[in-house]
From Swiss-Prot:
The modification Phosphothreonine is found at residue 201. SUPFAM superfamilies: Actin-like ATPase domain (SSF53067), Heat shock protein 70kD (HSP70), C-terminal subdomain (SSF100934), Heat shock protein 70kD (HSP70), peptide-binding domain (SSF100920). CDD domains: ASKHA_NBD_HSP70_DnaK-like. The keyword ATP-binding applies. The keyword Nucleotide-binding applies. It comes from the Bacteria. InterPro entries: ATPase_NBD, Chaperone_DnaK, Heat_shock_70_CS, HSP70_C_sf, HSP70_peptide-bd_sf, Hsp_70_fam. Residues 628-642 have a biased composition (Acidic residues). Acts as a chaperone. HAMAP family: DnaK. This is Chaperone protein DnaK.
Length: 642
């Protein structure tokens, strides 16, 4: 059985870890970095760039560079949160798919589901793991924000499938961080608050770590959060400030200039990072735009105090879920023994200060906020494969689950923060006399009104025997697996007839859609390999042409005119082949040049060998002239007179 890798699929950055013996190890990507930007770009030449390479060209290719896709995954286009993101001027197109989901589109009009784009990031992670391990990788544990709903979890699993990974478990990010901390911690029973402020999402989980019969038991008591609050919002606040200041100075609004907007976005992110350690920074963007009077430059000084005033409401927004999580766990702030900070945005001093004020204790600084989640995912992978023993993980469902009942009310079957896996049943009946069928409308959320909650799916239980209203007994069962993914069944107790629904297409993608995307991905991988092989063949050919011509020049008169002509002809034919896309033709002409040059190389080598032998013979005679030379040991003697 191969390794089960751990992947933190982040909004801004992603991270990969594997179990190396008894410890989890973060693996560097091909560029030598421990995290990979969650950015995917589609170039004019048809190449797909992922990570740093995609991020680097974002300014010149804003329409086809996709970032923060995690904020769209498993969401409907008409969701208020999605509409707000579109208003925030993401440079790429967000469109409404036929099924109502939020998809993205390239400037050429190619439509893609968010799981399809995220799969490119996962594929890079998979390749990194395979390069490190030297063996195929087919299984993974992938993390999601604790507050992700069923659709978002399923869409994440779909992304894994498209990337060629069997997702063995979906695990909540704060839980993974606690797992990473809990495995290293040997302090007995602890109640830990995991404050996870990442690039696009915020989670707070209250977790109990205890030693139960020698096992390290990690139990989630409660979780809460906001799936539209993260570092991207902090960047946006600073970006809008810079654009507003520039407009005041120059009278030009950069909001409608995609290239300028992308430059300001990147500068805002860089300034935000600098202000975590410096009191002020200069944002300097020369030639940001131009008008009739000439080019314009953006040069604005930003102090830490100014930046904190711009984002203080975002930081305060994160504290409300903290209160709710404590209430749901039935605990007070004084019951918390440790506070863990996870996610890159927690490096901001204001965030650390407000978390310290809220919980009344200093947050721990020994947990790497960028890597802890991936490490926890790798440990969970180790647990599932049997490589890691003595760990018991008890997670919870973040949102209540139920069905719509008479009057448009949501009746909850499973309350939020219920430990999973779990199974609950409840008996319902008909609303009218002789009702032949009932529609089971499955909902997720906390509102009383059914329409205000997230609809996960509908199905009908038909052929109910005629009976007065309230008489038939319809047993509805909700079954949540360890990934937090739901199965619902309805059974007529009188007839035994049963109907069920696995809420597996709530991501909006059918099995056929996913299979097509898997095939597209495989085709792309094949195309990428062909492109790579073609470039390798061209490079080999170019090197051979260069070395052949150089050798002919150096050998000079030792090569006949006929030989020179033959080599030059072969070089020209190979040059012509490298301008085309036929790898086999390039390789054939490369072989022809090698064969043409081989006799010359052999002749040159033989002449060099003869010269070396002759020179060696002369040198061998030289020592005979100095037969009176005596070998002696020398001893260094310090000169005291120095």
């Amino acid at each position: 059985m191969g390794k089960i890798i751990g992947i933190d699929l982040g909004t801004t950055n992603s991270c990969l870890a594997i179990m190396d013996g008894k410890t989890a190890k973060v693996i560097e990507n091909a560029e030598g970095h421990r995290t990979t930007p969650s950015v995917v770009a589609y170039t004019d030449s048809g190449e797909i760039l992922v990570g740093q390479a995609a991020k680097r060209q974002a300014v010149t290719n804003p329409d086809n560079t996709f970032f923060a896709i995690k904020r769209l995954i498993g969401r409907k286009y008409d969701d208020k949160a999605v509409q707000e993101d579109i208003k925030k001027k993401v440079p790429y197109a967000v469109i409404k798919a036929d099924n109502g989901d939020a998809w993205v589109a390239t400037k050429e009009g190619k439509k893609m589901a968010p799981p399809q784009v995220s799969a490119e990031v996962l594929r890079k992670m998979k390749k990194t793991a395979e390069d490190y391990l030297g063996e195929p990788v087919t299984e993974a544990v992938i993390t999601v924000p604790a507050y992700f709903n069923d659709s978002q979890r399923q869409a994440t699993k779909d992304a894994g499938k498209i990337a060629g990974l069997e997702v063995k478990r979906i695990i909540n990010e704060p839980t993974a961080a606690a797992l990473a901390y809990g495995v290293d911690s040997k302090k007995g029973e602890q109640t830990v608050a995991v404050y996870d402020l990442g690039g696009g999402t915020f989670d707070i989980s209250i977790i109990e770590i205890a030693d139960v019969d020698g096992d390290n038991q990690i139990e989630v008591l409660s979780t809460n959060g906001d799936t539209f609050l993260g570092g991207e919002d902090f960047d946006l606040a600073l970006m809008n400030y810079l654009i507003d200041e520039f407009k005041k100075e120059q009278g030009i609004d950069l909001h409608n200039d995609k290239l300028a907007l992308q430059r300001v976005r990147e500068a805002a992110e860089k300034a935000k990072v600098e202000l975590s350690s410096a009191q002020q920074t200069d944002v300097n963007l020369p030639y940001i735009t131009a008008d009739a009077t000439g080019p314009k430059h953006l040069n604005i000084k930003v102090t830490r105090a100014k930046f904190e005033s711009l984002v203080s409401d975002l930081v305060m927004r994160s504290l409300e879920p903290c209160k709710k999580a404590l209430e749901d766990a039935g605990l007070s702030k004084s019951d918390i023994t440790e506070v863990l900070l996870v996610g890159g945005q927690t490096r901001m001093p204001l965030v650390q200060e407000k978390v310290k004020e809220f919980f009344g204790k200093e947050p721990r600084k020994d947990v790497n906020p960028d890597e802890a989640v991936a490490v926890g995912a790798a440990i969970q992978g180790g647990v599932l494969s049997g490589d890691v023993k003595d760990i018991l993980l008890l997670d919870v469902t973040p949102l209540s689950l139920g069905i719509e009942t008479m009057g448009g009310v949501m009746t909850k079957l499973i309350e939020r923060n219920t430990t999973i896996p779990t199974k609950k049943s409840q008996v319902f009946s008909t609303a009218e006399d002789n009702q032949p069928a009932v529609t089971i409308h499955v909902l997720q959320g906390e509102r009383e009104m059914a329409s205000a909650n997230k609809s996960l799916g509908r199905f009908d239980l038909a052929d109910i025997p005629p009976a007065p209203r309230g008489m038939p007994q319809i047993e509805v069962t909700f079954d949540i697996d360890a990934n937090g993914i739901l199965n619902v069944s309805a059974k007529d107790k009188a007839t035994g007839k049963e109907q069920n629904i696995v809420i597996k297409s709530s991501s909006g993608l059918s099995e056929e859609d996913i299979e097509k995307m898997v095939q597209d991905a495989e085709a792309n991988a094949e195309a990428d390999k062909k492109f790579h092989d073609l470039v390798t063949a061209r490079n080999t050919a170019d090197n051979l042409i260069h070395s052949s011509r150089k050798a002919i020049q150096e050998l000079g008169d030792k090569v006949t005119a006929a030989e020179k002509e033959k080599i030059e002809e072969a070089c020209k034919e190979l040059e012509a082949a490298t301008k085309g896309d036929d790898k086999q033709a390039i390789e054939a002409k490369t072989k022809a040049l090698e064969e043409a040059f081989a006799p010359i190389a052999q002749k040159a080598y033989a002449e060099q060998a003869q010269a070396a032998v002759a020179q060696g013979g002369a040198k061998a005679e030289e020592p005979k002239k100095e037969e009176d030379v005596v070998d002696a040991d020398f001893e260094d003697v310090e000169d005291d007179k120095k």
